[in-house]
Amino acid sequence: MQAAQLSWELENAVTLIDPQRDSLYRYDEETHKYLSDTRPWTKDPHYFKSVRISAVALLKMVMHARSGGSLEVMGLMQGYILPNTFVVTDAFRLPVEGTETRVNAQDEANEYMVSYLQSCREAGRMENAVGWYHSHPGYGCWLSGIDVSTQDMQQMSGPFVAVVIDPERTISAGKVDIGAFRTFPKDYTPPKEEQEEDEYQTVPLNKAEDFGAHASHYYSLEVSLFKSALDTEILSLLWNKYWVATLSQSPLFTTRDYGSKQMLDLSQKTRRVARGIESNPPRGGAPTQVRDQQLERVVKDGQRIVSEEVKGLLAAEVKMQLFQGIGGKQTVEST
């Protein structure tokens, strides 16, 4: 049980802060007031550079995203801001209507959000809403056109961050697939070099157009995770409840539908690139470089699928070597 918990923490680089510095969880009114008055993010589109998320808040978001299955879910994050940094201390779900491509926040969700935050303040928790999160089941962490519009609207009222979690890739890879983003002002155009620096990620063919159309409207923030002394106790209690499922489940079976979709998507991308090569024979120059880039992306997608499948097979093999025949051995020894 402890090994599984430690493995999860190491995989996601969760660091333990000094117990004497647990004051990071306390709302710093002076810093918040100073930043709210000066509003440095209005002068620098890249002012916020990182997001620090508590381990418990991350678990809440991942479990919520996983519970939605193939449907998108949505929630709110609480915390505060520091210079250049968002600190997320907690998260809660929102009662929203979700589909396989979007989430729609209705009046009921807005009323629930106001009521929840008011109850927190009455209980002495002064953290503000610093961002929203939602899931992208199976198609990566990025902002769609609707997400960009939602984030633009939220940023008008103050500092806000958008977090995206892919529950399917999280289960398949064994590491939380998460991204944090902020949108640029309408009158700002990022340099071309900055757009090219973005790390390549696998996007399904049916989402590629939406991904490419809005990729220049936002930028990503570095995400780091932390836990306090109290978080350690809470995580232990959570693991007492879920460690059996961790050992008994196999990512190959849990995400078999996702794996099938990924291989189908890869075959479609391969056929598309092959048709492009056949219709435009290589003649040297820039077109050849474009084809090479397309082939390289297909190869990367295939390598990622293979690595996740191999990891699942290795996990199943380790469990079989550890637990297969234990009951039989005990019976023989008792006789």
UniProtKB/Swiss-Prot annotation:
Binding, Zn(2+): 134, 136, 147
GO molecular function list: deNEDDylase activity; metal ion binding; metalloendopeptidase activity; metallopeptidase activity
Enzyme Commission number(s) of this protein: 3.4.-.-
Motif JAMM motif, chain ranges: 134-147
Function statement: Catalytic component of the COP9 signalosome (CSN) complex that acts as an regulator of the ubiquitin (Ubl) conjugation pathway by mediating the deneddylation of the cullin subunit of SCF-type E3 ubiquitin-protein ligase complexes. The CSN complex seems to link protein degradation to sexual development. Required for fruit body formation.
Stretch forming the signal peptide: none
Cellular component GO terms held in the UniProt record: COP9 signalosome; cytoplasm
SMART domains: JAB_MPN
Subunit annotation: Component of the COP9 signalosome (CSN) complex.
Keyword Protease found: yes
Record keywords, A-Z: Cytoplasm, Hydrolase, Metal-binding, Metalloprotease, Nucleus, Protease, Signalosome, Zinc
Pfam families: CSN5_C, JAB
Assigned protein family: Belongs to the peptidase M67A family. CSN5 subfamily.
Gene giving rise to this polypeptide: rri1
UniProt-reported outcome of changing residue 136 to A: Inhibits fruit body formation
Subcellular location: Cytoplasm; Nucleus
Native species: Emericella nidulans (strain FGSC A4 / ATCC 38163 / CBS 112.46 / NRRL 194 / M139)
A Gene Ontology biological process term: regulation of cell cycle
Domain MPN: 51-187
Protein name as it appears in the record: COP9 signalosome complex subunit 5
PROSITE patterns given in the database record: MPN (PS50249)
SUPFAM superfamilies in UniProt: JAB1/MPN domain
InterPro entries for the chain: CSN5_C, JAMM/MPN+_dom, JAMM_MPN+_peptidase_M67A, MPN
Broad EC category: hydrolase
Comment block on domains: The JAMM motif is essential for the protease activity of the CSN complex resulting in deneddylation of cullins. It constitutes the catalytic center of the complex.
